[in-house]
Regions:
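C-terminal helix-rich "cap/oligomerization" subdomain common to oxidoreductases
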Residues: 2-5, 40, 48-51, 169, ...
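A short helix->loop->beta-strand "cap" motif at the edges of active sites that frequently abuts
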Residues: 22-24, 49-51, 172
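Predominantly a Rossmann-like dinucleotide-binding segment in NAD(P)-dependent oxidoreductases
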Residues: 62-148, 155, 279
Length: 284
């Protein structure tokens, strides 16, 4: 009933296409594909065969993400005017072609080229910012319009860092950051701040800093408690996998990281890498 795709980035499309054509639901490791054309083909196949695509972006399945989405969709901060977000993790080894040290004792060790080869969609954007943008797009439901990006390259010529400026179709602006330079055994950083016409939403997932609250222009505060350790430090894909199993069992569940969301993410990342090469603003 369902197929899980956990192959290297550049092989996702071929594997997922074959599974959908066999009438199976698919769970595809992020990113869904490494170019927009392939992502659109998978969406078309999913519609044709009435199948679900799920990307296990674990943060999207956290309750605080759904709460943030609810706050925004209910208009509690008004019209979105600006976003800023950052995602950082301890992965300089991967992006310079050294196998991930955390996998030393695993039965199978992934090839480092998955993340370090620029010809195989290596780099921090494809490998990590897919998480960040999936979360931002889920919460805001915005559509990206254009993007500019600067980066620090690794020895293998993939991106270690990303400094991104973006414009959305509703006129809002965004400033986004990615970095592989975080000490090991920390859990990394992931925060999203969304500024609206009547308030600002703050979502922070860094260890010992976890919080979700809204500060309104009338000085009222709306707070949703996040337990310490339940943010970036507790990242996992259990909730996503459970949802996928329920989808295969034909249960009525919410797919918090579906194919349409993944397509938007791929559109952003493809344009981001175009900007890195052209050193110009690129349309999405």
């Amino acid at each position: 009933d369902g197929v899980i795709i956990s192959s290297p980035h550049h092989a996702h499309f071929e594997n997922a296409k074959a599974a959908l054509e066999k009438n199976c639901h698919v769970m595809i490791e992020k990113p869904m594909t490494t170019n927009v054309k392939d992502a659109e083909i998978l969406i078309e196949l999913a519609i044709k065969y009435n199948k679900e695509i799920l990307i296990p972006n674990g943060f999207n399945f956290k309750s605080f993400m759904s709460k943030a989405e609810e706050i925004i969709s209910n208009g509690l901060i008004g019209e979105i005017k600006h976003l800023d977000a950052a995602f950082s993790s301890s992965l300089i080894d991967l992006f310079q072609g050294i196998p991930l040290s955390e996998s030393n004792n695993h039965t199978f060790q992934p090839h480092a080229s998955t993340w370090s080869d620029p010809e195989k969609a290596g780099g921090y954007g494809w490998g990590q910012l897919s998480h960040m943008f999936a979360g931002i797009l889920k919460i805001t439901n915005l559509d990206p319009e254009c993007i500019f990006c600067l980066s620090v390259p690794s020895p293998t010529k993939v991106d270690y860092t990303n400094a991104i400026s973006m414009k959305f179709t509703n006129g809002a602006t965004g400033s986004f950051s990615g970095s592989a330079f975080v000490p090991k055994n920390f859990g990394g950083t992931f925060y999203i701040t969304i500024h609206g016409t009547i308030g600002t939403l703050y979502l922070d997932m860094e260890i010992k800093r976890e919080r979700l609250f809204v500060r309104l222009n009338d000085e009222n505060i709306i707070e949703h408690k996040i337990k310490e350790g339940d943010g970036a430090y507790s990242y996992g894909t259990k909730e996503a996998l459970n949802t996928f199993v329920d989808i295969c069992l034909n249960k009525n569940v919410t797919n918090h990281s579906n194919g349409e969301l993944a397509l938007k993410t791929v559109k952003i990342l493809e344009a981001m890498y175009k900007s890195l090469k052209s050193k110009k603003l690129e349309r999405i």
